[in-house]
Amino acid sequence: MADSFNKLTFSLWSKPDIEIFYSLPEEVNEDTKVLFVIHGASRTAESYFTKWYEYTNNKNIILIAPKFDKAAFPSYNSLVVDKKLAQGKGCEYEYSGYCLEPQNNPSNSLSDSISLIFDYFRSKFDIQENSYRIYGHSGGSQFVHRYLLFGQDARAEKAVMANAGWYTFLKDINYPYGVKDMPISEDRLKWFLSVKGAIMLGDEDTDPNDGSLRNDKGAKEQGNNRFQR
């Protein structure tokens, strides 16, 4: 195996198929690390992959960049395929319009997505490492911190969240702005707070009229711009 640009279609779940861009080192061994890169609202997974490949090329890293297509995954940043279809059976918090538990809503929940992709790559390429690192930008940053909160695995070793437009806080308010009545256990919360993570912000990202900035009531309560939030 050589370090190179690769693409596959992932379909081993009940959600819509996705394209995954990835690269492999010369040899996959016990020291090989795995890095996920989650795109923003532009959905340009290939360009994110290309930029990161400049840094991972010739290193013992498997770089993985899934693409959550806008037509098929309009609400990926909130950890569901489509919030209009998010209600599922057995969810006590359906009033929020979201059902994040895959056992109750397997075709729409993304809280098992990274885990399933990681397991697939581990099996396909005989990866011995059982943890991964993950980076998300903008909408991808929203996806990452929500995945850390509600995901179905605890294998993220490190996480970087860059320039999210708004956040889910550990507050007693409705999801996706808070965690009121959401399925997060005490053990999961302890793990979430123990993950080595970094939040990246641009100190000049202060335009309250940015066309890509969410400006509903819940978002505005977090601040007037990305930097404040």
Predicted regions and their residues:
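The serine-hydrolase catalytic nucleophile loop
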Residues: 45-52, 68, 211
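Active-site glycine-rich loops that stabilize anionic/oxyanionic intermediates
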Residues: 39-43
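A domain-start/cap signature at the N-terminus of enzymes
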Residues: 1-34, 44-47, 55-62, 86, ...
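The feature captures the conserved acid-bearing segment of alpha/beta-hydrolase catalytic domains
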Residues: 157-229
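Conserved acidic catalytic loop of the alpha/beta-hydrolase fold
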Residues: 22, 113-130
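A conserved amphipathic alpha-helix that caps or lines the catalytic cleft of carbohydrate-
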Residues: 56, 118, 122, 147-148
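Conserved alpha/beta-hydrolase
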Residues: 59-76
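Short acidic, low-complexity segments enriched in Ser/Thr/Gly/Pro
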Residues: 77-98, 130
